[in-house]
Amino acid sequence: MNKQVSYYCYGISFIDMAMLTAAQIKQMEDGDYIVYKRQKIKRQKGVKPISIKITPAIRQLIGSLQAASPTVDDFLLPIVTRSGYTGERLYMHIRARYSKYQKYLRLLAEELGIDFHLTSYVSRHTAAMTLQRNNIPREVISQMLGHADLETTNIYLDSFDNEVINEAAKVL
């Protein structure tokens, strides 16, 4: 289910999902939003927060995850499972959870007969490509992915075109 959260939340990374807190839910005129800065770049100058409207699908997914496994401290999702962890200890805990998540994705791919390397990052790629295929401007996709500049998004999305070409070539 974390994979679905990642997809519906614009391809949010595992570390960003893990670090989300209830305090990052903001009420705005047109509904509730998750507002956060990517862990990867949050300390860089001029980084804008990403705002994700909480749709009924997102609300249901979060509710299902919280019902299945209790959250600790102020974390929004039950990825962090130990209370009171901070700093290096928290980082190592999240890394261990990430490794377990990746392992289960590999097992799921095997069970379903999926013939490519299924990772947590696939949901980010899938979200970006779905947006591009639906003619969403790259400037908007860039903002949704939290990229610092449009060039990063262009490189990111153009690399997918090569992946599609390579997959198509296998059919020949």
Give the predicted meaning of each segment.
Residues Q102-Q143:
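Short, basic (Lys/Arg/His-rich) helix/loop patches that form interaction surfaces
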Residues M19-S64:
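Conserved tyrosine-mediated DNA breakage-rejoining catalytic core shared by Y-recombinases
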Residues M1-F14, A18:
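Basic, Lys/Arg- and aromatic-enriched nucleic-acid-binding interface segment
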Residues Q24-D32, I114-F116, I136-I155:
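Short, polar N-cap/turn motifs at the start of nucleic acid-interacting alpha helices
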